[in-house]
A protein has these predicted regions:
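Active-site hotspot residues in diverse enzymes, especially metal/ion-binding acidic/histidine motifs
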Residues: 1-191
Length: 191
C-alpha cells in the first residue's frame, strides 16, 4: 500500500460518515452510503438467476462476491452475490464502494471456462479492502470496544460485520495496542 494511505482512508471514511450525518463512531447503513455515492446496489440473482450463482459457487467457491460496473449515462452499479452471509455481503458492498470512492479503474474482463471474471489490480484491491474496513468499523468505535475490553465477536455483533472483519480491524488498526498502553500507563501511576 502506498505510504500514508491508511491514514488517508481513515480520514476519507470519517468525511463520508459526516456527509451522511453519522457520528464518528457509527457504522453506516451500507445501502445509505451507496445511495449517497450514487451507486445502485443490485442482487446478482436478478441478473443471472440463483441457479447460475450456485453453479458458479460449486465450480469455484468464492469466485464472485461483488463487482462494480460503470454504465452508460454515468450510472454506477454494484452487483453482489446473495449466496454469501449478510455480514459478508455488507463487506463486499463496502469493498465495491471503496473502489468507487478511490476512483479505481474498472478491471479487465476475462473468460475462464465459459465464465466471465474480472482481473484484479492487487494494490487497488488492498486499498479497497482497507477503506472498506474503515467505512464499516470506524476507528472511534474500535477504540470504544478496545478500551472496554470487548472482543472481535462483540464488535462484529454491534456493527453487523463478520467476526474475521472485526478481528482484522482490531488487529491492524493499532487500537488494541493503544488501549493496552493506556491501561499500563494508568496502572503505573504515570500521567
Amino acid at each position: 500500500m502506498r505510504r500514508g494511505f491508511k491514514s488517508e482512508a481513515e480520514r476519507l471514511a470519517d468525511r463520508v460518515r459526516t456527509q451522511i450525518g453519522l457520528r464518528s463512531d457509527a457504522p453506516p447503513d451500507i445501502r445509505q452510503l451507496a445511495a449517497h455515492l450514487g451507486v445502485e446496489v443490485i442482487d446478482a440473482q436478478i441478473l443471472v438467476g440463483m441457479e447460475s450463482l450456485r453453479e458458479l459457487e460449486s465450480l469455484q467457491p468464492g469466485a464472485f462476491s461483488a463487482a462494480t460496473f460503470h454504465l452508460a449515462g454515468g450510472r454506477t452499479v454494484a452487483v453482489y452475490n446473495p449466496c454469501n452471509e449478510p455480514a459478508r455481503t455488507k463487506s463486499d458492498i463496502a469493498h465495491e464502494l471503496a473502489h468507487v470512492m478511490l476512483g479505481h479503474e474498472v478491471r479487465e474482463l476475462q473468460q475462464i471456462g465459459g465464465h466471465a471474471f474480472f482481473t484484479c489490480n492487487p494494490e487497488q484491491e488492498e486499498e479497497a479492502n482497507w477503506l472498506a474496513g474503515c467505512l464499516l468499523l470506524p476507528r472511534e468505535l474500535l477504540l470504544h470496544h478496545a478500551y472496554a475490553g470487548a472482543d472481535a465477536q462483540a464488535l462484529a455483533a454491534t456493527a453487523g460485520v463478520s467476526v474475521p472483519m472485526a478481528r482484522f480491524r482490531l488487529n491492524t488498526s493499532g487500537v488494541l495496542l493503544q488501549a493496552r498502553r493506556s491501561r499500563t500507563t494508568r496502572g503505573s501511576g504515570r500521567p
